Amino acid sequence: MTPEFSRPVRIDTLGGSPRALAIEAGEEERATLARRFGLVAIDALSADMRLSRDGDAVTAAGTLRAEVIQSCVATDAPVPARIEETFTILFRPQPAGGADDEIELGESELDVVFYDGATIDAGEAAAETLSLTLDPWPRSADADAALRAAGIRSEEEARAEEERAKAARSPFATLRKP
C-alpha cells in the first residue's frame, strides 16, 4: 500500500553532512489523509527537517506544521486546530526476522521507524507524527453546555454526587446532626 503522503528519500543520496528537506502535502493528499485519520479536513500540512545519516540509520529532526479541523466529540461541531510540533525520528533498517516478530525498544528508541530497502519515507513519517499530535477528544466551545442539556454530568459533578451517595450509605450517617 502506498502512503497518501509519500516522500521517499533514497538513503544512498544522504552524505556525511545533514540535508535539509521541506515537504508539503497537496490538496488530494490532505483529503485522503483526513479520511484516514477521521478528520473533517486538513487545510495545510508541511514539515521542514534535516536528515542526517549514520551508517544505515537516518535521523530526521524538524518541525511539523498543520491546520486541521476535527469533529467535537460531544456536538460533532467542527473544531479547528493549528499544530506546530517538533520531532526527531530515527529510521533504522528492519531487523532480521519476520515482520510479526515482537521487537523490544528502549525508552530512548520510541520514535524509531523501521524501513525495508534503500529508501525512507519522510512524508509518511510526517503523517504519522501528525496523527500522534491530534487531540484525541476535541471539544467545541459549547460542548459542556450541550452535554449538560443532554443530562450528562462532568467528571467533577459525578464524583461529588458519588461522594454524597457514599456518605449517605454510611452506617454512621444517621448519627450526623443536621
Language-model segments: residues:
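A positional/architectural concept
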Residues: M1-R65, I69
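Short, intrinsically disordered, mixed-charge
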Residues: R35-L39, V73-P80, L132
